[in-house]
């Protein structure tokens, strides 16, 4: 069964999901800031998701909104603008049937080797974790939505941990959960 998908934040992850779903026959729209080539079968739009006139070019009531943008800067203001304000505006303007919000394990305060699982409290002391948690709550305020807390993505161009390990600079006796970008 085919469905409609809108991707806000069609960077590496968003573009991969968009391409996969388009190849499956779904109707896919993808928005990103930079004017770069997009795989075939995707209705590509370049622009700033913070601008109402850009959002209005996307379909209303899509089956799924995949919300996976990146802030312009690593500041509390930009995180709030990108994850909370833009998500709220997208929810109001696009009225999708379901939202998948790509969050992060930054929502957890445990960062000194503690074991973290789905029962761990999401009470980060860092601004990025607090803002992401606020955005998760906004997303989850509507039934059927989901927040995905990705802990780290590996794959082409994402070699920092591998490079550190090869140089002997990696952390020893440390657990980490990673996901390959193809998955």
List each model region and its residues.
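Conserved Rossmann-fold NAD(P)-dependent oxidoreductase catalytic core, especially the SDR/UDP-sugar
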Residues: 88-125
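NAD(P)-cofactor binding segment of oxidoreductase domains
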Residues: 62-100, 134
